[in-house]
Regions:
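Carbohydrate-binding surfaces of carbohydrate-active enzymes
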Residues: 58-72, 77-191, 196-598
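Mature N-terminal, pre-catalytic/accessory segment of carbohydrate-active enzymes
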Residues: 1-70
Length: 598
């Protein structure tokens, strides 16, 4: 139209900010026919409930043929492309944070780019470091927290209630903008993550590059940690997702991706890409974002043995409890203050750069760990040198370059140290509070608490330099210096070999994986005396066969061939056959490279 906006500009130099507010602009990405319309406002509980009720009114989950037949309602990852506002936001912000967002709005908003990620470019006014640190970053932190609270109340809680009213479990990939990567999974019946096939799977694991050959996505460890904290026995995963090597992927790469997925805490794999395609459908059938699981694939005859293997692994892990006595508090609050919440599992910023490598090094060295949050720490009990939350119990808390804490979190950490626990602050020591309101008072309170703890128990609250380069070597040094006793000592740790420790009744279960598809791994495992007193077995998930092992003085020499995984199980049962000696290997093996004839 011909509408005009008049601005009365006083004398001097000014920067004019303007906003474009769009209502209902977002549409479902690649929606199926009939489901490609507008995206519901996830911050409006009434709109969410109306949408869900329309669905259940048509499907009748609680009566008729579907009653009791549907296990769960599934919600895929949240790719909301910039959904950051809802009617009443100003009032909600002031009610929750105690001050008005209005005067700060131009400075906390960031230009929105693809998938809701902020555009990384300079624009608008420039501010001093003090204003950026003490005002803008603190208000931004509060704004993200209000969005996170509104999302939980208006979508997660509404979705959960709707599922349970309809006799369904809630299964959700609960991460991304406006969702806490640990806590949101704790609210759900079946939290889910995702594992992808990327270039280099089984061949490379570059440091500080969360896509480099990993298989599991960076969010998997967050999701599984939340599930274990909430005592969930199912950690689901959209597995074998694939966009770059759909037809070139080998079954060997599929196996390694699945094994690594399990190492990240997954115990329930949902095969992505196992799509139904009518036989009359031309090559390559119906496939979207999945690996080519199809009867026309050359390795199709071998899919069933792999699926049997996955079923055995899942059955064992679902009936066992992953063990962890190290808690990791990542600097999420600092990240959100400085850079904003991220679009997990593909964050625009990884903070610090090694953030997704630390838990790997812990498990590559024989220890076990969970991510925790400030809320988890505050709700934990402390006694006997342990931080306890539900069934989880930790002897050591790693603060990963954490600078900011709520005063109540700092106080709980002090209680933990006073009770005999150990805190290792990596790179930085917490010294300030969170949020804009009463910032100076909260800063002083946090600093005073931490300073007192450091002065009183310098041997139990320690600061160490952040890793530079060799994460595994750095952690091994930390492990030795501070007595971080592993569940089994690994003589020759390797980035491609990882071990998870589980308990099931009186069984001690070690899941050991060689995720290299190019080389074998030879190592010596030394088990604690109370474990080694039981009979050792090897459970072969590829065949379902069990054999006893001869473990002398608690030590086992273990060789894993490329892409091989084994369960080493200690139990009281001593009746069975010993593992046969391995067949001799050729002294002159032939490498099958390039084109060859049979």
């Amino acid at each position: 139209g011909n509408d005009t906006i008049m601005v009365d500009v006083p004398e001097g130099e000014h920067v004019l900010y303007f906003f474009v507010k769009l209502n209902g602009y977002s549409r479902v990405i690649l929606g199926a026919p009939g489901a490609s319309g507008p995206v519901v406002n996830h911050l409006d509980g009434k709109a969410v409930e109306r949408y869900l009720d329309k669905f259940s009114d048509a499907m009748h989950f609680t009566r008729g043929k579907l009653k009791g037949k549907i296990r769960a309602a599934f919600c895929d990852s949240f790719e909301l492309e910039g959904n950051n506002w809802t009617p009443g936001m100003f009032a909600e912000f002031e009610k929750r944070m105690g001050y008005s967002l209005d005067p700060f709005l131009p400075y906390v908003f960031q230009r929105t780019g693809a998938m809701g990620e902020p555009v990384r470019e300079a624009y608008g006014s420039s501010f001093s470091p003090e204003v950026t640190r003490d005002v803008i970053e603190r208000v931004r932190h509060d704004f993200w927290h209000v969005q996170m609270q509104l999302f939980k109340e208006n979508f997660i809680d509404v979705y959960n209630d709707w599922c349970h009213r309809n006799g369904l479990k809630s299964r959700v990939q609960a991460y991304g903008h406006q969702l806490h990567p640990v806590e949101t999974s704790m609210y759900l019946d079946i939290p889910e993550c995702e594992s992808w096939i990327h270039d280099g799977i089984g061949r490379v694991m570059e440091p500080n590059q969360y896509l480099s050959g990993r298989g599991y996505s960076m969010v998997n460890k967050f999701v599984s940690s939340g599930a274990f904290l909430a005592n969930r026995n199912i950690v689901s995963c959209e597995e074998q997702t694939n966009v770059g090597n759909i037809f070139q992927t080998t079954l060997e790469e599929v196996k390694v991706t699945g094994d690594r997925s399990n190492l990240s805490g997954v115990n329930h794999s949902v095969l992505h890409g196992f799509n139904y395609s009518p036989r009359q459908k031309d090559f390559f059938g119906w496939i979207q974002f999945g690996t080519y699981f199809n009867e026309n694939n050359t390795w199709w005859p071998y899919v069933r043995p792999w699926m049997d293997y996955k079923a055995r692994v899942s059955a064992l892990l679902q009936n066992s409890v992953y063990q962890a006595d190290i808690a990791i508090l990542p600097p999420l609050e600092d990240l959100w203050s400085i850079h904003g919440m991220q679009r997990d599992p593909y964050p625009g910023v990884t903070y610090p750069a090694y953030a997704n490598d630390l838990w790997e090094a812990v498990q590559q060295s024989g220890n076990g760990c969970d991510y925790v949050s400030e809320k988890v720490i505050c709700q934990s009990s402390v006694a006997g040198g342990r931080l306890r939350f539900g069934s989880r119990s930790y002897k050591t808390l790693l603060l990963m370059e954490v600078e900011s804490l709520e005063p109540r979190t700092a106080a709980r950490i002090a209680d933990f140290v006073a009770a005999g626990g150990r805190v290792i602050a990596i790179g930085k020591v917490p010294h300030k509070g969170l949020g804009f309101r009463d910032a100076a008072a909260k800063d002083a309170r946090v600093k005073a608490i931490i300073d007192r703890v450091v002065a009183t128990w310098p041997d139990r609250f320690v600061r160490v330099d952040a890793p530079q380069g060799d994460m595994l070597g750095w952690y091994r040094t930390l492990q030795a210096e501070y007595g971080l006793t592993p569940y089994a000592k690994i003589s020759d740790p390797d980035r491609f070999m990882m071990m998870n420790y589980y308990k099931s009744g009186d069984r001690d279960i070690y899941f050991v994986v060689n995720s290299s598809i190019e080389r074998s791994m030879q190592t010596r495992l030394e088990f604690p005396a109370e474990v080694a007193a039981k009979q050792a077995w090897v459970w072969d998930a590829e065949t379902g066969v069990r054999h006893m092992l001869d473990v002398q003085d608690g030590t086992l020499e273990l060789c894993l061939t490329p892409a091989e995984a084994k369960f080493i199980v200690f139990e009281k049962d001593r009746g069975g056959q010993m593992l046969p000696a391995p067949a001799p290997r050729s002294a002159n093996p032939i490498a099958l490279n390039g084109i060859w004839d049979v």
